[in-house]
């Protein structure tokens, strides 16, 4: 819906055309007749810059899905904020959440989806990680940015002065983590691109505006 140009006040004329004037049958115009694009045709529902950001974000998510071989891009900000956010540095597969029952109670752990893709066979050898450790890793990365506040703020200000609307938007989102002192899944989803985990335990946290933190 938000991909429709009407939301930013523009109009694309002759999306369809009449093929039978007696029955008034119309079909989609796939280049058979000329189309006309009119800017500022009417009062926009969404301002032009926000509309453009939405289109860029849709394209980014599509590219993200293709790069990480995901069927869907899912954002469960509160109940499961790490969905489609954690990836294996060894095989590239996404990590999935598992609920383990132990003598100490239930544990939420994440492991590579290629670990047991074929029943009874061990695939990827990467280790699992507790969800609590993922939260701590994100907060540790945030702490690194807070520690180098002046440097990252200078980077964000430079991005805000640039022409890339999406990076300008991401940079503005990043300021909210400068005073973050506890994990918040909603905020994390607004600033995090992904987390990668290697077999030797190295964690790389990549933020949407391009900053990488190696832990």
Where are these regions (language model features)?
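Short, hydrophobic/π-rich interface segment
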Residues: 173-177
